[in-house]
Amino acid sequence: MQPTEDLPRGTPLSSTGHPLPRRTSPEQSVTLRHHQLARDASLKASLGSAPPNDSNENSSSPRRASSGESHETGQSDAKKWFNQSNQNPTATFDSNAMDVDPPFFQKESDSSNEDKPYQFPPATIRIQSNARSSSADDYRSVIDDLTVEIQKLKEELKRYKQRGPDMLRKDKLFEIKIHGLPKRKKRELEATLREFTATLEGSPNTSSSKRNSTTKPSRHATRDRMYSGSGSKSQSKHASSSSGSHTRPVDSAYASMSTGAGSSGTSLNRPQGGSRFKTNEQKVDHYLREIPEGLYPRFVSMTEKEKKKLVVRRLEQIFTGKIGGKHVRRTQPTLTPAVSIALPAVQATSIDFSPQQQQQQQQQQQQQPKSNFITNPGATFSSVPEPLREARILPQEHQYGHVAGQKGRSHDIGSASNSNEDQTESGGNGNSSSNGNDSGTNPSPPMPPPPEQRPTRPRDLDPDRIQIPSENMEYIRHLGLVPPELLTNPPERTSFDFHPDEEGWVYLNLLCNMAQLHIMSVTPDFVRNAVVDLSAKFQLSPDGRKIRWRGGTDGTKFSSESSGDLSQRSPETDDTENTKGDNHKRQKTGHSTGDSGSSGNNLPKFGGPQVSASSESFHYKPLFLHQQSPNEQSSMEDGTLSSFGPIEESNADSRWGQSGSGASNRRKRRRDGAIIYYSGAPFCTDLSGDPGDTSPATYMLSSERERPDAQGQFARPLPFRSGSGSSITRRPLSDAHLNLGSIPKLQLLNEGVSIPELVTDSGDESSKLSMEFPWSDEPQILEVRPLEPCGLGGVRPEDHFMVVVTTRRSKLDARVGQRLEGQRKLSEEMTDIVVNRLATMSTSSPRPSVRRLSNMSDSSKIKIEYLSGRIKRLEPVSLPPPAIFFPPFSADSCSEDDFGSDGDDEFNSSEEFMSRRANPHQSDDYPDGVDLSSGDEDGEEPEDDIDASRMVDDMSLPGLGRVPRGSQASTEVVPGSSRGRSNSASAEAVLRAGGSSAATAGGVESDFSISSSQG
């Protein structure tokens, strides 16, 4: 480097002569000089403060003394710290001093002892400050996460919130959104909420401010009364815990919850009073003694098949009341009729028992006195009934305003079953479900309304409890969506015979919850697979959301249950149900749906007449769900309909995934709007609307009646899928390696079209061909796929026909040797191609001609022989409802085929042009994929083998002949070519009259056109 005296003269240069960058030497650097001065000052300050650190070693830490006697003050002063830092800036370079000397240092002390010096040891101070800072950081992270989550929720609420009219916004009470609720239930809910809001203050003119000012004190008073039992205790507890403590104050909510079992029970429940509520002296040991074994965790190793069997048994137990299997607890829990403790006098006054029934009731009460006390230790034998566990299900008379006091009371008693301790049927202690039916023949004085609901006990949730099918059916019927008055010509039936869905469909999610399948940790897809694979009593809907019981009193019998250790019902269950059946036979005086023995009369009605499921189920996951309704709406819009039309029975067991139903639900969810109610207003604003324009009664027909014909035209057939998931019926490129016999035969969905069996002509030529080349003569059933009218092309609804072609094709599975030979030829051809390309690249010569794979294609193509063909006229299709009307552009407008009339004189003559003007519905070209001519390229005319007696409309297709063995199977006809017109001149008029008709090669599939008129 150059010496320093040369630097001011100009730019410094390096040893090589290049100018150095714009920077000064280290000796003249201002930054380095300041750093050196600061380092020297910090060293002097540390050496000068060392003696005070040694003298005050016990009072403060050495690191705190470096900031200048800040340890002498009891609490740091921000102003003093700021002045001291400015006066002694060199001390700030000490990292140790900056770590422990923040501007605000607050001691952990109360206001009463602020003047006392801070005398904690240094180590203790460091530990406490670190702990405090770490806990604060933890809470800060939680608070930040919650803040971000709240912001996201607010944004989402703004996105989904729908504002009503601005003038009514100040009087807005609340808004609701309805998802999947049927129309009738939605109307009932809207009417109830309208009446509630209109009569909230008794006058529509009442302002919202008055209502809020009058209702708020009453709400606060009610809340104060509810929490008055534990208010004083919680306050005293909170005061004692917070006084004199140096920890964080305890939140009042946690303080009220931590006051013990007694106070927590009274603070969260309703106010005490009367003998109907339990006392707070119930011990924990009694509660633990009530927990059944089924609620304890079971570590049982099961295979997937065994778990599927258990799932099926749980679901079938709801309808049969029986369960078996090696993984089920063999000893069923002892039936503890807890209702009999509190209702002996009630039952004696409301029901007239025979002497035998009274004797059995007394024997049962004597056999289980201890278990009753364990189940309900606070209960006493009195005439006051115990609160019911379940919500009361009022009879139909009460729901429509009729007075039926005794029937409602007896039915309320019967609705308290479905729990393990409330099973009064099995022990013979009166048929609870038949009480509602026997009330007409056993008159008794009306009873007062039952008390409030009691809390759910652990025994009520026992998964191994014996299910009562009648009570389960009554619970499902109560969730029914179709009243009898909405049905056309409703049959004469009682309220107990009415089904929630006339076809018996119940939501699978409901049955999974009733069977408590969540304990087994199974997914809904696993439950669907288990039902489809193993159950013989359930039928799954095509969308997989609903399930139907086929009827009967016995569940599915598995092959493993034939052994002695696995039975369908346990011995104790057998004895119980036999006793139950005998008691019901004695107690029946009218209609009864009491036990599983008599439930056979009702279960077939619930399920309806069932048709056996199709043996061929779809093992694919569809990309799109083809809806059956004309407006493409989800089936959950009407809760009673899962699917209708002929697709329901043929594809009942199809295992559909969640993509189809999920897409329909998402499509419907976007249309869901809010229903806004206003204060004192007799109306509401409904932004959701009514999806669909079809009456609900249309879909609520039972399976016994005939369905309307209007639904048939909207029922779309499900697409056919091959083994690999393709929707193409015949795959000419890959069927050579497959077995054609594995393709399932398609059913003819359109029953109005009768297609005769397709047979071959018996001739000498065909017999000669069969000697050296095998042919397949098996008749096949064609699939008729209806095409919706689109209104394009100028065709009319009468142009609805189908081309039926009889073909004969070879059996490709017998040509394994030729396939291997073709592969060898293919390898030779590829070798020649590579050699030719290499020769072209090396010599730069013109590319030689490459041999085509004509020999290969001739030896491996599919041989199809057309034997006969005919035109089948179909019924005209109905036009879709017009969306918008387009008037004609001009009066003398013709079809779009006229635009190409004067374009090429070689292919369009004046006669053809005039014929098209005479018939404007003709088309210049053939539809795509149509092959009605099979002549070879030498111009050979095909033979005419069409039988005139088999023609429907006296129209022939002479172009359908035989294909020679050496020619290509499907000769493509170029649209508008002379060869295409010459070979099929007689069929031209037929094809042009119908728009698009197709006869696929092989006769596997035949498409037809459904056309509509313009506009």
Swiss-Prot record:
Keyword Membrane among UniProt keywords: no
Localization, UniProt: Nucleus
Start-end of Pro residues biased regions: 443-453
Keywords of the record: Biological rhythms, Nucleus, Transcription, Transcription regulation
GO cellular component terms given for this protein: cytoplasm; nucleus
Function: Circadian clock component involved in the generation of biological rhythms, in particular in rhythm stability, period length, and temperature compensation. Behaves as a negative element in circadian transcriptional loop.
Family: Belongs to the FRQ family.
Name of the protein this chain belongs to: Frequency clock protein
